[in-house]
């Protein structure tokens, strides 16, 4: 744990910035709502927690803290215990779930475990207080996280939806929203917040392990981009945000188009062949999403769009172990 000794300021430009953002989106964190904040103890989540606690007097939120101990290093239990003690001193309710590397060994496993645990904790809080259900889960993702996610998904060949995946809010489950209030803050700014407000920071050694792809991007790729083009991290994050807006517009237009293309069994192939290859790919992506099918890469969507085009024969394409797309002269169907 690191700590500074400066005098805390009651209201800063950081408070004002978040306050203005929340006022412009009143449904993001509604007045008087119950909030469950995921706190690792690192600079981003501690900065978020402090700002939320200071704004609490204006919004009258009920704040709860959740911590996930992955057990990936020897200090993880100590970090959890010290964070719990700090939260108790702040008179905050604190909840902790623990796992280990045998159960959660990859970045994706860890992310899925965290969200599953957060959803369960939110449900428990709602059950304990039906009059004040916990419908908002907060994380300390920043502009840097969005840039790293963008680069990872770009390298993997993600479609537009994948490139705009880290959003300010999204639905985790019915009546439970994931909110990222400081997504427009940079990591440089969160460390400044922690320094100015005398906040403790717990350093997670696993964050420096470049065996994990996100850490490798953070340690090796981002510094090169910044040396070539200073502030590129923020510009890439802003691009991802614009793509999010574009994807939402595309989502609405695709739904309108699907209304004319849907049949009792799937999609009308004769109508689909009249569209351009690019538009077919957009429609297919939306159709698959609506049917809760796995997200295909841009390359897979282009390949599928090409195969169902004009003057192409019948065929099929596996999209998971238990799901395939089959098409004939008249229709395009999902087959289990």
UniProtKB/Swiss-Prot annotation:
UniProt-listed InterPro entries: Rossmann-like_a/b/a_fold, TilS/TtcA_N, tRNA_Ile_lys_synt, tRNA_Ile_lys_synt_N, tRNA_Ile_lys_synt_subst-bd
A biological-process GO annotation: tRNA modification
Enzyme class per UniProt: ligase
Predominant location: cytoplasm
Subcellular locations according to the entry: Cytoplasm
Reaction(s) this enzyme catalyzes, per UniProt: cytidine(34) in tRNA(Ile2) + L-lysine + ATP = lysidine(34) in tRNA(Ile2) + AMP + diphosphate + H(+)
Molecular function GO labels: ATP binding; tRNA(Ile)-lysidine synthase activity
UniProt entry keywords in alphabetical sequence: ATP-binding, Cytoplasm, Ligase, Nucleotide-binding, tRNA processing
Pfam families xrefs: ATP_bind_3, TilS
EC number: 6.3.4.19
GO cellular component, one term: cytoplasm
Binding site for ATP: 40-45
Family statement drawn from the similarity comment of this UniProt entry: Belongs to the tRNA(Ile)-lysidine synthase family.
Function statement: Ligates lysine onto the cytidine present at position 34 of the AUA codon-specific tRNA(Ile) that contains the anticodon CAU, in an ATP-dependent manner. Cytidine is converted to lysidine, thus changing the amino acid specificity of the tRNA from methionine to isoleucine.
Domain-related comment: The N-terminal region contains the highly conserved SGGXDS motif, predicted to be a P-loop motif involved in ATP binding.
Listed name of the protein: tRNA(Ile)-lysidine synthase
The organism of origin for this protein: Prochlorococcus marinus (strain SARG / CCMP1375 / SS120)
Gene name of the record: tilS
